Every structure is written in C-alpha cells, then in structure tokens.
Amino acid sequence: MRGSSITLEDYTLEEGLRIFRDAGFDTIEMWRPQLRRCKTDELRKKFVAYAKGMGILMGGLNVVGEDYYQPFGTDQQLEQTLTNLMADADFALSLGTRDVLIWEGVAPKGTTEAHWMSQLLPRLIELFRTATNALRSKGVRFLVEPHPFTVGMSDQFLIKLCDALDPGQFGITFDFCHYGVGRPNDYLEAIPALGHRIRNIHFSDTDQKTSELHFPPGAGRLQIQAMLEAFRGIHYDGTLALDLYAYPTPVQALPLGAARVREACEFLGLPY
C-alpha cells in the first residue's frame, strides 16, 4: 500500500517511516525536502536500505513546488529549470525509483487559457521533450500534478501536453483534493477526459474551499464513489497513494485512510 511522505512533513524520516509502516503502508512517495540531509548518493542508498529494512520501498520522488521550477520565465530560467529537473531525475534514480512527481506550472497572474495554449504550452513541451529524450535510456518518468492554480486544470492544455510526449515517460498524477477545489463543479468529467493519461492517483478528500488541505477520503465533500466509478470506467491500471498533506491530525487519520485505500484498490482491481 502506497502513501505520500509529505503527509508527515513535521516528523523525522525515522518517525515517518515507522508511522507509515505501523499503519500498513509498504511503499512511500518521498518528498524531496525531507531528504535534505541525504546530500550524497551514498547517503541516499543508506536511507533506502534503512527503509527497506523496515519494509518500506520507494514509490517516487515528489519535487512539486521547488523554487527552481520556472518554465514560464526567461530563457535563462527555462534552462535552469531543465538543469535542475535532470538533477532531480538522477536523485530519484539514486533512490531506486523512476518516477519524478512535479507540477506542470503555476499560471501567470492575469493570463487566459488562450495565452496558455499559444505561449506556455510550446515551452512545456520543449522542456519535457528535451528531458525525456535525454533520460530515455534511464527509464525516468515525469508525472505532472495539476493544482487549482496551475495551467493543467485545463483539460485541453493537459491533453495536448501529454499527447506531445512519450506516454511511457510522461503522465498525470490526479489529486482528488486539487480537482475538488480547482474544478468544484466538473471534477468528475475530468477523469474520462484525461483517461489513459492518468498514471497515478493522490487519494484524498476536500472541503472544496481550501487549496492544499487534503482530508482523509470520505471525510470531505467529494463524491468519492462516483470518482472511483469513473476511474473504473477508464480501466485505470496505474498507482494510487494516500495523500493527507496539510491535514492537522495525519497520524490519527492514517488508519482510516489506509482502510479507504484498500477499499479503493479492491474496487479498481489494483494491487495494494
């Protein structure tokens, strides 16, 4: 069963791994800031061995929100974004995982979807095409995670981005909370629209008002069962991770969340 380490951002690595293990999780998506002390490849390998000894495997590297990621800035910022994205890919590989979780980009203030399509989409395609081509032999995959304030909340934008890239190296992380806030009236419709491009789910709930506040599934306002039915309708066969980022009592909520993950995976026919 898969979880997201950012859920326990206030805990040490050792504490977080123990809490996840005791709640029944065996695979974790690691948030990069929590690995700030793993400065060398050797230290990262030691951390991975420590986690494995506790029964925890690495399920991806989450670098969403890193300051370097400025694909819509100057040409120099775009180049720096590429350089750091490649470095994060190597970081992920040193953990023994191929997946780099990133966001596609914050929408510049005052811009429209038409501007995103004509001016920003080509830059993103160039960025990820260059990165995936360079990393093809290493098997790295980028999974972009739309947020309520990013350009990927537009299905049209996200579909064109995905379809311009190798599906074996690029896909979507569909976060229940983000879509519930960013698309409060039509989040269900986004699932069949994006379809096979979705390769990872961040399973959570939301009050549909507060951005980034991930409730345990079933504790918010989303139509969770209808969303799962939509995923079954597209024959979803990717991964699913519990994400309780910003929830005030994550340790208390983990067992309930774990039960909901098991139910969701059984419903979708996914391993857990």
Predicted stretch roles:
Residues 42-53, 124-135, 190, 226-230:
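Catalytic-core regions built around general acid/base machinery
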Residues 13, 37-44, 74-82, 113-121, ...:
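Flexible, glycine- and charge-enriched loops at secondary-structure boundaries
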